[in-house]
Amino acid sequence: DRKPKQLSGGQQQRIGVARALAANPKVMLLDEPFGAVDAITRLQLQNELQKIHKELGDKTFVLVTHDINEAFKLGTRVLVMDKGKICQFDAPREIMRNPKTEFVANLIATVKEQEAFWSELK
């Protein structure tokens, strides 16, 4: 019985995805869908989206994000752009193993640096 503005960011995101799915589209565009929520809610929403994608195998999700970790986690194919130009379009594993441009290599280096940081904390 709450008004939309009284819902948390995560609740609003879930409702937005549910409303879009109710129209039964073949393709869904998600533009920074988890950008305005805390890290815990973001992870929950990412996991829920993965589950939905598996359950509704006939759907294509186009996810726009500035978070390379999110793109690699959720994407079966990832398109990396720099200044409006396509740098690479591949599976996440291929991008990690074989970056095609200096920009992509630098992006991958940030992922590896973050991994090293978290490893050091253990």
Task: Give each language-model segment a name.
Residues 1-41, 52, 56:
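ABC family nucleotide-binding domain
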Residues 4-5, 92, 104:
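Conserved ABC ATPase nucleotide-binding domain signature region
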Residues 45-63:
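Conserved catalytic loops of ABC-family nucleotide-binding domains
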Residues 71-73:
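A short, surface-exposed alpha-helical micro-motif characterized by mixed small hydrophobic
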